[in-house]
């Protein structure tokens, strides 16, 4: 739902748990060091500041990893109480800003990518790792054959307009001629 309406709160849509979800379509920062877009005293710097991940503030935990860790905790809780679960996992990746996920950044720089392209690649790899971690949890806990996974996105490859991309473009949106 839109900002400042009841629909912006996932609890109003029937969700029992909300981890870092809000009405903004993106985020202010992927970086725990930047408190995901909050000042040190907890004030949001913009409507895009990510709520609900305060325990990761000031750490090197990229928001993609923080969301994955929290999702796994929710799955662990459902498993502990032998409850069925519905996990709606909505990553912020690969939305702008193009913050670098340092877990993967050097790998792409060594391949000769520009800073922008390497940062973009780290967002994709971080999301891939997140999905892999969730799939591993399902396998380890005997839930893989009893779980339906639907993977979708509202984003195409990042647009090629000046300022968004540089160097060789590693994504394309054919037959469309721009992004999203």
Can you describe what each PLM-predicted range is?
Residues 5-14, 96-100, 136-180:
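Histidine-centered active-site microenvironments of extracellular/periplasmic hydrolases
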Residues 62, 66-79, 106-147, 164:
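A long, amphipathic alpha-helix that forms part
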Residues 26-32, 37-49, 132-141, 166-180:
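Substrate-binding rim/cap in mid-to-C-terminal beta-strand-loop elements of soluble/periplasmic
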Residues 17-20, 85-90, 123-125, 148-152, ...:
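Structural recognition of the beta-strand scaffold that forms the well-ordered cores
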Residues 53-54, 65-67, 128-130, 153-156, ...:
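A short linear-motif detector with a strong N-terminal bias
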């Amino acid at each position: 739902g839109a900002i400042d309406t009841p629909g912006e709160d996932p609890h109003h849509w029937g969700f029992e748990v909300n981890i870092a979800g809000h009405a903004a379509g993106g985020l202010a920062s992927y970086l725990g060091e930047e408190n995901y877009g909050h000042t040190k005293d907890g004030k949001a710097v913009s409507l895009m500041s990510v709520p609900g991940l305060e325990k990761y503030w000031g750490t090197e935990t990229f928001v993609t990893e923080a969301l994955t860790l929290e999702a796994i905790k929710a799955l662990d809780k459902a498993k502990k109480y032998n409850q069925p679960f519905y996990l709606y996992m909505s990553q912020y990746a690969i939305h702008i800003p193009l913050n670098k996920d340092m877990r993967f950044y050097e790998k792409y720089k060594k391949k000769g990518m520009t800073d922008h392209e390497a940062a973009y690649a780290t967002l994709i790899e971080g999301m891939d790792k997140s999905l892999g971690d969730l799939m591993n949890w399902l396998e380890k806990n005997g839930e893989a054959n009893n779980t339906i996974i639907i993977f979708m996105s509202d984003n195409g490859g990042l647009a090629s307009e000046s300022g968004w991309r540089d160097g060789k473009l590693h994504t394309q949106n054919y037959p469309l001629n721009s992004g999203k």
